[in-house]
Amino acid sequence: MLERASGEIVGIEIKAAETVTGRDFAGLWHLAERVGDRFLAGFVLHLGTQSLPFGPRMRALPLSALWHARS
């Protein structure tokens, strides 16, 4: 979890798998429910290669995206 001084929150989960399912977002959905409007986004980082949306403000991202800059 990352929190700004203003109280806004981004949730991050890391999975040691190449595939992601909706169940992998359960903790992030719970966090979003608890903090309400302060929740900005949730991300599941995984070992696969695709970036996929999983609903409003939720996204699965390849872990490698952290090291690959776009030009």
Question: Which residues make up each language-model segment?
Answer:
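A cross-kingdom feature that marks ATP-driven nucleic-acid transaction machinery
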Residues: M1-S71
